[in-house]
Amino acid sequence: MKVILLKDVKTLGKKGEVINASDGYARNYLIPKGFAEEANKTNLHIWNNKKEAERKQKLAEIEAAQKLAAELKGKEINLTVKSGENGRIFGSITGKDISDELNKKFKINIDKKKIVINNIRQLGTYDVEVKLYPEISTKIKVIIAEK
């Protein structure tokens, strides 16, 4: 019996694959447990439509991330903080601080988790990476000045 795997099954294959399984194994285990469904015309058509919709959504997300990366490229933000002697700041600059400043200055809303930042504990200029999508990232310049 041909079945479409709905989940990864260690011994059979990955989600979305159409495989041949014995009738008893498919009817008594795979289908009732939700690991697979019968591979008839209707289910194959539904599965192909779902895959196509996911592919289109992924392309739209990549396009939006590339557009945002182009918009962010070369942007510069200024943060003013209290500092002690030798230019050492009190506390540290976080992704949330940078995200809030980007939103305030450029009206660009970026999740703080997408901002890759090392510990910034000194006054100065830093290049900060913003990961918008797994393979799409850009750098912005962050200038830390004393209040």
From Swiss-Prot:
GO BP: any one term: translation
Ranges in a coiled coil: none
Keyword Ribosomal protein: yes
Gene name of the record: rplI
Pfam families documented for this protein: Ribosomal_L9_C, Ribosomal_L9_N
InterPro entries in the record: Ribosomal_bL9, Ribosomal_bL9/RNase_H1_N, Ribosomal_bL9_bac/chp, Ribosomal_bL9_C, Ribosomal_bL9_C_sf, Ribosomal_bL9_N, Ribosomal_bL9_N_sf
Classification via SUPFAM superfamilies: L9 N-domain-like, Ribosomal protein L9 C-domain
Molecular-function GO terms, alphabetical: rRNA binding; structural constituent of ribosome
Keyword Chloroplast recorded: no
Family: Belongs to the bacterial ribosomal protein bL9 family.
Protein source organism: Clostridium kluyveri (strain ATCC 8527 / DSM 555 / NBRC 12016 / NCIMB 10680 / K1)
HAMAP family named in the record: Ribosomal_bL9
Disulfides per UniProt: none
Keywords for this protein: Ribonucleoprotein, Ribosomal protein, RNA-binding, rRNA-binding
Protein name as annotated: Large ribosomal subunit protein bL9
